[in-house]
Regions:
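Short, Lys/Arg-rich, polar N-terminal cytosolic tail immediately upstream
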Residues: 1-13
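Helix-loop-helix hairpins in multi-pass membrane proteins, especially solute transporters
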Residues: 74-216, 229, 238
């Protein structure tokens, strides 16, 4: 093709142009990421508005996440075939259209269909901006890329519940989709006009290995389905989950076989030949586990134990976002001066410390009690994300960088999916254990326990003269208190286990080989 004879060097673009391109793409990424959390915070209102059942409404999120997970690794291939410009513009445009369609959904089936389209198109924007940023910038400027994109990645799940709750209460649930229209249209127009960093290779579309594509779709879609629906359906006790798991396992085998033997693979696994990239992906898996799980657990605690509404929850968790913003600059500065292995080790240790502090919650914890642990967690996560991105993507060039970016981002999403599924299971199991222990403790409490129950019964009897009704009220009050305290202890158990997981991840740091520091003296000519 004539286009191929005149390749574009993204690194040679004028600096203002590079920053404009990066800003447009980063905003598109933020729009796609925050949408997940905005909708998650408003699912109850969407369910009521569409008259959907509990099992049906879960597919509004599951469908989106399944489609997004499939697109993330596929984006590298499409970026080469269509060019970064047209892939990003098409993704932003279709994401905007599907958002509008979600807002106009007339029943749960139409909503699920439009959410799948929204997830598929949104998934292309996330890895594309990482690869483009690393291709355009070098030196100290490149060091800012993982910091800024890391901040975007963690701010979205932090701010999403606040924005979603406010929009739903102030305007209505359909507004959470309509809000994407204006910024989405703007990103689409800007993408068409400014993102000119490479040229399309349309001939690649003729080389698509459809069996490889199908295997990847079944593998990632099936895995997301099992992880999302498993906790609700008692995992493999449910026939549907068991069948999906077997199908996913078969798809994994076919995916690996086609990745290694196909002449036109959709996803290239060659980046894993570099041990540092493989370990950085494992870091990202753990980071995704901790980031999304902790962001999921704190609002659940505040809602179920403290009885907070959406606005109160948002006000409490926003502390984490503020700490993330403040730590972004520090993380970026460290990336040019400190070995990435040291920085990520500090980040993992601080994150583990924050989780350990959170594991001492009582049922009375609110904004002030959570302030310190949340601020520390927000500060620490940036010290985890920035060096892990540097370790993963710092040693790749050109096309391979796209595949590495897709695989790396996929790991964080998988970590989040695995994390939420696992902590849901841990939470339910541990809560039941603590309820049983409370029952045993009450039975063994002796006179002091009997006196306490007698005092409670007397207070209830004063308000409820009918003896039978008073007994029912007392049983309900006792069950509520026991359930609340058992759930609080279960939350603490989960945070404690997560803290140990982050400390265990430290063993991988010595096996990584960091790229040269961006702020270091220029390397000798033969350094590469």
């Amino acid at each position: 093709m004539s286009d191929a004879a005149k390749p574009i060097d993204p690194g040679a673009l004028p600096t203002p142009t590079k920053f404009l391109i990066f800003a447009v793409m980063a905003f598109g990424q933020f729009m796609a990421l925050i949408d997940i959390q905005i909708v998650a915070a408003s699912l109850n209102s969407v369910q009521a508005g569409l008259s959907a059942g509990p099992d049906e409404i879960s597919w509004v999120q599951t469908g989106y996440l399944m489609a997004e997970l499939v697109m993330i690794p596929f984006a590298a291939f499409l970026a080469q075939a269509l060019s970064t410009r047209w892939l990003f513009a098409l993704s932003a445009g279709l994401f905007t259209i599907s958002s509008a369609l979600c807002g106009m959904a007339w029943d749960i089936n139409s909503m699920i269909l439009f959410r799948v389209l929204q997830g598929f198109t949104g998934g292309a924007m996330v890895p594309t901006v990482f690869a483009t940023g690393f291709a355009m910038f070098s030196g100290p400027q490149r060091a800012m890329i993982p910091a800024i994109l890391g901040m975007v990645s963690v701010l979205a799940p932090t701010l999403g519940p606040t924005v979603g709750g406010w929009l739903t209460e102030a305007i209505g649930w359909r507004s959470i989709f309509y809000i994407n229209i204006v910024p989405g249209a703007l990103v689409t127009l800007l993408a068409i006009n400014v993102i000119k960093v490479d040229r399309p290779k349309l001939s690649m579309l003729k080389t698509i290995d459809y069996s490889h594509l199908a295997a990847m779709a079944v593998l990632l879609g099936g895995l997301e389905y099992v992880l999302e629906e498993g906790p609700r359906r008692q995992w493999f006790e449910d026939d549907g989950i068991a069948i999906a798991a077997w199908v996913t396992l078969v798809a994994l085998g076919l995916f690996i076989e086609r990745s290694l033997r196909s002449g036109g693979p959709i996803v290239k696994l060659s980046p894993f030949r570099k041990p540092t990239f493989a370990f950085a992906c494992l870091f990202n898996l753990v980071i995704g586990f901790g980031l999304y799980s902790s962001t999921y657990l704190i609002p659940i605690f505040l809602g179920r134990v403290r009885g907070y509404d959406s606005l109160e929850i948002g006000t409490t968790v926003v502390v984490t976002g503020i700490a993330q913003i403040l730590s972004t600059v520090i993380a970026a500065r460290l990336s040019t001066r400190v070995d990435a292995r040291i920085t990520v080790s500090i980040g993992l240790t601080l994150f583990a410390a924050a989780l350990w502090l959170t594991s001492h919650m009582t049922s009375e914890w609110g904004f002030m009690a959570l302030l310190g642990p949340q601020a520390l967690r927000g500060f620490a996560i940036m010290l985890c994300i920035v060096p892990s991105v540097t370790l993963a993507l710092g040693g790749f060039e050109a096309a391979e960088l796209r595949y590495a970016s897709g695989l790396f981002n996929l790991m964080r999403n998988l970590g989040g999916a695995i994390g939420i599924a696992v902590v849901n299971t841990w939470l339910g199991d541990n809560a039941r254990i603590h309820v049983a222990r409370f029952g045993e403790a009450l039975g063994e409490a002796g006179r002091s326990g009997t006196d306490a129950l007698g005092t409670l019964a007397a207070r209830i009897a004063e308000r409820t003269p009918d003896a039978a009704q008073a007994a029912l009220v007392m049983q309900g009050e006792l069950a509520r208190v026991v359930g609340r305290e058992a759930l609080t202890l279960a939350f603490n158990d989960v945070f404690r286990i997560m803290a140990v997981l982050f400390l265990a991840a430290l063993v991988m740091a010595p096996f990584c080989k960091p790229p040269p520091l961006a702020g270091a003296a220029p390397p000798p000519p033969d350094a590469h």
